[in-house]
Amino acid sequence: MSSGRIVQIIGAVIDVEFNRTDVPQVYDALVVDGTDTTLEVQQQLGDGVVRTIAMGSTEGLKRGLPVTNTGAPITVPVGEATLGRIMDVLGRPIDEQGPVNSEDKWSIHRQAPSYDEQANSTDLLETGIKVIDLLCPFAKGGKVGLFGGAGVGKTVNMMELINNIALKHSGLSVFAGVGERTREGNDFYHEMQEAGVVDVENFTNSKVAMVYGQMNEPPGNRLRVALTGLTMAEYFRDQKDENGKGKDVLLFVDNIYRYTLAGTEVSALLGRMPSAVGYQPTLAEEMGVLQERITSTQTGSITSIQAVYVPADDLTDPSPATTFAHLDATVVLSRDIASQGIYPAIDPLDSTSRQLDPLVIGEEHYNVARGVQEVLQRYKELKDIIAILGMDELSEDDKMVVYRARKIQRFLSQPFHVAEVFTGAPGKYVTLRETISSFRDILDGKYDNLPEQAFYMAGGIDEVVAKAEKMKSAA
């Protein structure tokens, strides 16, 4: 193992000088002697000098300090020992529950599976959330993005999906907290304990591994923590059981935008010219390296659900725009819908899914989904006429479209289990079968006689009918 010394420190970026014959390779991990600071080599500048990013705080470091090359990339513990534990970017435990006793350690930099290893699946993943199951269904082994600006409900939707899928899913989950709030990470950990997904008494009963690099941490941690979580998920996917099969793994990433942002923070310090809106010129490549590894193989699958922050609600911003290309389903959260008090604030016209195909989901589901979108789109077009001339100027057919669209809009709202503590309303899980039949009946005019208020924040259609009866008797 070669050793060198620090020659320059600028924030999170540190230059280290080695003998010309012992220059470390790109992505090699270096350790600053006498500290627990790890550096990752990013560039070779020539003359034996390498430029690195610190995985942790650079406070207390100074020029001349000795640095040792480990001769290998950053490796993290993988396997059963990670379940129930909270780890940092280097796989070190941060939950004060003792060391992570893992026999295997994998490098966080790995090749994506080759074309012949990959497998695609058309099996649907039921979420119990009406608007998602109907209009942007998820595929098992697919990649899903939750897009939204600040405060429209990305994390709440993510937590509800974890509640509805991970708790009912018999496989394993990995949660990567990338540059998000520590409070949310703490809440998530305690919720998982209450749900029995994390068993502190006996970690072998746990079903989820957690990797956190929160927003108070240096950019190096936030840049690599998504890769750490992904590596742990890949291990579960690729480890074969006695039948030669891997596991079906759920990977939750909150928030993929912070991964991009961490790259932006260090990009200028690494001497790269910024591109559009100040992002790093390597934005598409960095995103591709991460996303191409999140895939399903012949052995097992990774189903990934990623929250994506949208700066200033601009979906054309380079960061969310780059993410769009990699996803199978996009769930777009809208501030306009949130301002109407309709939650989840998912835009039914902007959200898309590759699964929305009659060959995959069946004719009935496809026709109902397109029928709902058609009614909502027509209502959107009529809104301007209503604002100028009023409802009376519309034809009878258009009036009927407006009444049905308003009922559909309200019926797309739903009380969440994770929001029970705030709203006091018990959460509802609605099966796909019930969702399709309910919306088909609304489109067919079966519930034209019910007031639109009855459709708001209801689970199934039976609840709507009961609410309408209650309103009638109260009136």
From Swiss-Prot:
State the compartments where it is located.
Cell inner membrane
Keyword Ion transport found: yes
Q: How does it sit in the bilayer?
A: Peripheral membrane protein
Sites binding ATP sit at G148, G149, A150, G151, V152, G153, K154, T155
Q: Does the keyword Ion transport apply?
A: yes
Group of enzyme by EC: translocase
Gene3D superfamilies to which the protein is assigned, alphabetical: 2.40.10.170, Bovine Mitochondrial F1-atpase, Atp Synthase Beta Chain, Chain D, domain 3 (1.10.1140.10), P-loop containing nucleotide triphosphate hydrolases (3.40.50.300)
- Per the UniProt entry, the Enzyme Commission number(s) are 7.1.2.2
InterPro entries, alphabetized: AAA+_ATPase, ATP-synt_VA_C, ATP_synth_F1_bsu, ATPase_a/bsu_AS, ATPase_alpha/beta_chains, ATPase_F1/V1/A1_a/bsu_N, ATPase_F1/V1/A1_a/bsu_N_sf, ATPase_F1/V1/A1_a/bsu_nucl-bd
Alphabetized, the UniProt keywords read: ATP synthesis, ATP-binding, Cell inner membrane, Cell membrane, CF(1), Hydrogen ion transport, Ion transport, Membrane, Nucleotide-binding, Translocase, Transport
Please name the GO terms that the record assigns under molecular function: ATP binding; ATP hydrolysis activity; proton-transporting ATP synthase activity, rotational mechanism
Q: Which reaction does it catalyse?
A: ATP + H2O + 4 H(+)(in) = ADP + phosphate + 5 H(+)(out)
Q: Which domain of life is it from?
A: Bacteria
Q: Name one GO cellular component term.
A: proton-transporting ATP synthase complex
Q: What does this protein do?
A: Produces ATP from ADP in the presence of a proton gradient across the membrane. The catalytic sites are hosted primarily by the beta subunits.
Q: Which family does it belong to?
A: Belongs to the ATPase alpha/beta chains family.
Q: How does it assemble?
A: F-type ATPases have 2 components, CF(1) - the catalytic core - and CF(0) - the membrane proton channel. CF(1) has five subunits: alpha(3), beta(3), gamma(1), delta(1), epsilon(1). CF(0) has three main subunits: a(1), b(2) and c(9-12). The alpha and beta chains form an alternating ring which encloses part of the gamma chain. CF(1) is attached to CF(0) by a central stalk formed by the gamma and epsilon chains, while a peripheral stalk is formed by the delta and b chains.
- This protein is called ATP synthase subunit beta
Q: Which organism is it from?
A: Psychrobacter sp. (strain PRwf-1)
State the taxonomy lineage: Bacteria, Pseudomonadati, Pseudomonadota, Gammaproteobacteria, Moraxellales
Corresponding gene?
Answer: atpD
